Amino acid sequence: MKVSSAIALLLPVVAARFVDSAFEQDHVQLHPEQAAAEQFLIELSPGETRWVTEDEKWELRRNGQRFMDITDNRDLGLASAQSATTGPARVFPPNVTLDEEVFPLLANLSKGELQTHLEKLTSFHTRYYRSEHGRASSNWLLGQVKKTVGEAGGFKHGITVKPFKHPWGQNSVIARIPGQTNRTIVVGAHQDSINLFLPSVLSAPGADDDGSGTVTILEALRVLLQSEAVLAGKAANTIEFHWYSAEEGGLLGSQAIFNTYEKASRDVRAMLQQDMTGFVQRTLDAGEVESVGVIVDYVDPGLTAFIKKVITAYCDIPFIETKCGYACSDHASASKAGYPSAFVIESAFERSDDHIHTSDDLIKYLSFDHMLQHARLTLAFVYELAFADFDKLDKAAAVSVAPEMGDL
């Protein structure tokens, strides 16, 4: 019997043992009897589904299996699948072009801001999405995003910061910066954390997974709003920053959001996920070069190619191609909804942080210098695509694939 299997058998017993004391002392919501009775429909690969209990979900995660919990979002992607054969492929700029505007902004990114926010975020006992701590951390994050926008004067220009509410209590957070069109560029990170051994009881500081991504895009937002053109809504495209709830439970928060967007026919032109942006030690220990891991499986190839150009132009370290499998982060929800999505991580996937999903996912293992490179990527990515003329790009692409007279 695997060790994880043996531990899994003990989980309901141990959870029940800690219910009273944990709830009274830490205010963590513990409902082991409810979790044991619930059944969830998960998707382990495209079209491969299975009904499981809550404990079985965590057993799969402990064994390295990723999945989407599609129980409440079984229709995600249906509308986009019906139009996929007739809709045009999305195209992206062939090169970066706004270096004169972007580089001055990059100079204002701050490691101090990253550290201050991450210290607060990891001070919560856990950010488990079904816990009171998870609710509290989400409320703090919502307030911090509002503070960031307010200090920049963003609310006077129509920028909004709103919770996207979920039935489990921990809400997602969406900051929206209106542009000249409703075409939307999204950057995301997940705000929740988990300890895969007794999620409702044990601590889960989640410094790297995904506290690092959460504060990375928050810092990118802070500096982006220093652009008068962006602040005043002069960008060609609308920009959204997303902090997803319940990624660890099977991409629950992001599925709910992109399901809503798909049904509303929202025009999302690009989505970039930042999940784990601060750990480099295993890369260095292996004698390899510090780099940004660019995921190349289950992503949009055109958007991913553009991201490589952004890294080359605006980051101080190179990129390395790597794979993470199906449903490995929230970009998978956007992709399933028919939106071009991409994912970057701190290193080659096999060199990524091995402290995650435990009480040992701590700040002391992270590099804020490396996190800053991800912030540079996020800021440059958003700025370049915010001002991209997608109408012009679409027309150019249509001309390039049009048949010549001799082919008719």
UniProtKB/Swiss-Prot annotation:
Glycans are attached at N95, N108, N182. Zn(2+) 2 binds at D209, E248, H357. This is Leucine aminopeptidase 1. Residues 17-89 form a propeptide. Monomer. Its EC number is 3.4.11.-. Its cofactor is Zn(2+). The keyword Hydrolase applies. One of its GO terms (molecular function) is metalloexopeptidase activity. Keywords: Aminopeptidase, Disulfide bond, Glycoprotein, Hydrolase, Metal-binding, Protease, Secreted, Signal, Zinc, Zymogen. CDD domains: M28_AAP. Disulfide bonds join C324-C328. Residues 1-16 form the signal peptide. The keyword Protease applies. Belongs to the peptidase M28 family. M28E subfamily. Zn(2+) 1 binds at H190, D209, D275. One of its GO terms (biological process) is proteolysis. GO terms for cellular component: extracellular region. Binds 2 Zn(2+) ions per subunit. Extracellular aminopeptidase that allows assimilation of proteinaceous substrates. It is found in: Secreted.
